[in-house]
From Swiss-Prot:
Family, similarity comment: Belongs to the RNR ribonuclease family. RNase II subfamily.
GO terms under cellular component: cytosol
Keywords attached to this entry: Cytoplasm, Exonuclease, Hydrolase, Nuclease, RNA-binding
Protein name stated in the entry: Exoribonuclease 2
GO biological process: mRNA catabolic process
Organism in which the protein naturally occurs: Yersinia pestis
Gene: rnb
Lineage of producing organism: Bacteria, Pseudomonadati, Pseudomonadota, Gammaproteobacteria, Enterobacterales
Domain RNB: 189-516
Chief subcellular location: cytoplasm
SUPFAM superfamilies in the record: Nucleic acid-binding proteins
Catalyzed reactions: Exonucleolytic cleavage in the 3'- to 5'-direction to yield nucleoside 5'-phosphates
Function per UniProt: Involved in mRNA degradation. Hydrolyzes single-stranded polyribonucleotides processively in the 3' to 5' direction.
Molecular function via GO: exoribonuclease II activity; RNA binding
E.C. code: 3.1.13.1
Length: 644
């Protein structure tokens, strides 16, 4: 009777049209229910039965209903799924497979099956790559995924590395070597093999890409010659090797090992500036005055060099600091180290006055056993030899930036514009509230930014510095020259690590065109996008492996009385993020661990403080004592508690 009734259809259409709808992102909880967050402002409750249709992170459209004075969201349409490609652990039960995504808020197993091409017989605990293929909001009965790749079995000691690389779709192996020979016969190389070039690196470094030589001019100035390995002498543009390097973009440095951008035979052998081996290089010569100024006599050329010594950071630092456990092999090498130290001091002083110098932060190095277990974490402080190399490389990169800008007008530039113009007023307000007067428009200029940074660096704590970082832009990669506010420089283009950075290889080719007077093509914008994306993925991979190893390392300390000194690095509504200064691990302190009465404690990201009953008890950048309360291995989270 009601079938095909136009009035009923019209009524249904009206009801559908009149039902309020919102678009937002699903936020899951550990208790089965969830919330639909709309524009970060409003959230609507999603009951457990409705949560079975969606997944944490899904962007959906939902209808709104009222139940007992509470607005409830009922998922209706999928806009964008949270999961597409993901990694997880396989569960096998009665020949049926399911996979649990490796994500802290996704705990439900998803039915799955291997794609036809995958021949591996999956077992319980295996790690796999999967692709979502069914979703309840697409009309399917349940979630389902296809297993597209086997990563490793659950017993593999190197799970943190293999799973992380698979998650970010990064390579596990070095590229295969392709027959390569020197291919730049048209490039005239001067013979500098008689000069006393030295390399300074870590003891374990094999891919040495920079060597240094200094000549004392006798008038207080020095002629610095920076020789950089020349992989483009072997890697032809658009060749198979070049396309591989372009895709990888960087050597991927993970705890315990690296995955090179170029085949190891090139990176660690043919191109590496090994001692007493003749190598093709690009060379930059520049006079540095007694005050540390770079003169206008910058000159680039192609050359042959032969490193006379592979020096190690700690050895050189010890010798310069008067610890005689190590000695240079001869007086010529000793003289080079002494002259390099003088250049370092002059350049550092110049940059402190006219540019910006980063505050020294220690590096943390995992000492690993044969099975990937963390034996120890070594704190490596930056010493004088590290600063020597850093000052010489910064000088070389400034020279390249200026030369490319003058001769070509383009290159691969590192650009950082300081404060976000949309947020600079907020930055000025925070500064003013903390007793630092600042003109928003002046902060957007390089001199104004540098003046502020020098003032902040002179303050007794990092509180204000850490407060205003969120108003700054991120460094970018650009094909046109631009300032680098973070370094306090008007232009910066790296070319000193071509073995491990594809952007530096691009700049090598441009510098060669400049040297030979040939026509050069401006790099395509797609290259900068690829470089930025790969840099982001490599950093995430390094962080993820590090989190896994820290969780393994700190698990035995959970629940013990062992105390750690920690620095507060972030304050969120839910608690504090701290960095343990002894080993570099990041831990979370939930607000209830700070004060038992939740209503009396306020953790404010806006003010960078924690208040109890209106009294400030913690501020961002404070150093506090903590104990490890818990280590959650499944999410690699370290939970700490303040020592009372």
């Amino acid at each position: 009777m009601f079938q095909d009734n136009p009035l009923l259809a019209q009524l249904k259409q009206q009801l559908h049209t009149q039902t309020p709808r919102v678009e937002g992102v699903v936020k899951g909880t550990e208790k089965g229910f969830g919330f639909l967050e709309v524009d970060g402002q409003k959230s609507y409750f999603i009951p457990p039965p409705q949560m079975k249709k969606v997944m944490h992170g899904d962007r959906i459209i939902a209808t709104l209903h009222t139940d007992k004075d509470r607005e409830i969201a009922e998922p209706e349409t999928l806009v964008e799924p949270f999961l597409s490609r993901f990694v997880g652990r396989v569960q096998r039960k009665d020949d049926r497979l399911s996979i649990v995504p490796d994500h802290p808020l996704l705990r439900d197993a998803i039915q799955c099956r291997p794609v036809r091409e995958l021949t591996h017989s999956f077992q319980n605990g295996d790690w796999a790559v999967a692709e979502m293929c069914r979703h309840p909001l697409k009309g399917d009965r349940a979630f389902q995924a296809d297993l597209t790749a086997f990563i490793t079995n659950g017993e593999d000691h190197f799970v943190p590395w293999w799973v992380t690389l698979a998650r970010h779709n990064l390579e596990r192996e070095a590229p295969a070597m392709v027959e390569s020979a020197l291919n730049d016969a048209e490039l005239e190389r001067e013979d500098l093999t008689a000069l006393n070039f030295v390399t300074i690196d870590s003891a374990s470094t094999e891919d040495m890409d920079d060597a240094l030589f200094v000549q004392d001019n006798g008038d207080g100035s020095w002629l610095l010659t920076i020789a950089i390995a020349d992989p483009t002498a072997y890697v032809v543009e658009n060749s198979e090797l070049d396309l591989t390097a372009r895709k990888r973009a960087f050597t991927n440095y993970l705890p315990g090992f690296n995955i090179p951008m170029l085949p190891r035979d090139l990176s660690d052998n043919l191109c590496s500036l090994r001692p007493n081996e003749r190598r093709p290089v690009l060379v930059c010569r520049v006079t540095i005055t007694e005050e540390g100024t770079l003169s206008n006599d910058i000159r680039f050329s192609a050359a042959w060099v032969e490193s006379k010594a592979k020096l190690v950071y700690d050895d050189v630092s010890d010798w310069l600091e008067g610890n005689n456990r190590w000695q240079p092999q001869d007086t010529a090498i000793a003289e080079q180290i002494t002259l390099l130290k003088r250049i370092c001091d002059a350049r550092s002083n110049w940059r402190q006055q006219h540019a910006l110098v980063f505050k020294d932060r220690p590096d943390y190095r995992f000492l690993l056993g044969e099975k990937g277990e963390v034996l120890d974490i070594i704190v490596e402080h930056r010493r004088i030899a590290n600063r020597i190399v850093e000052e010489c490389m910064i000088a070389a990169n400034v020279c390249a930036a200026l030369a490319l800008r003058e001769h070509l007008g383009f290159g691969i530039y590192n650009v950082h514009t300081g404060f976000d113009p949309a947020l600079v007023e907020q930055a000025a307000s925070v500064l003013k509230a903390n007793g630092v007067g600042a003109d928003p428009q002046a902060l957007l200029t390089l001199p104004g930014f540098c003046e502020l940074r020098r003032h902040l660096d002179a303050l007794p704590t990092q509180f204000l510095d850490s407060r205003i970082r969120r108003f700054q832009t991120f460094a970018e990669i650009s094909t046109v020259p631009g300032p680098h506010f973070g370094l306090g420089l008007e232009a910066y283009a790296t070319w000193t690590s071509p073995i491990r950075k594809y952007g530096d290889m691009v700049n090598h080719r441009l510098l060669k065109a400049m040297i030979t007077g040939q026509q050069a093509e401006k790099p395509q914008e797609e290259i900068t996008v690829q470089l930025a994306e790969r840099r982001r993925l490599n950093r995430m991979a390094e962080r993820d492996v590090g989190d896994w190893l820290y969780a393994r390392y700190l698990q035995p300390q959970a629940g013990t009385d062992t105390r750690f000194t920690a620095e507060i690095i972030d304050i969120t509504r839910g608690g504090l993020r701290v960095r343990l200064l002894d080993n570099g691990a990041v831990a979370f302190i939930p607000a209830p661990f700070i004060h038992a009465v939740r209503d009396e404690v306020v953790c404010s990201q806006e003010t960078g403080t924690v208040q109890i009953k209106g009294e400030t008890v913690y501020s961002q950048s404070d150093k506090i004592e903590v104990r490890i309360a818990e280590v959650r291995m499944e999410t690699r989270n370290v939970i700490a508690r303040p020592v009372a």
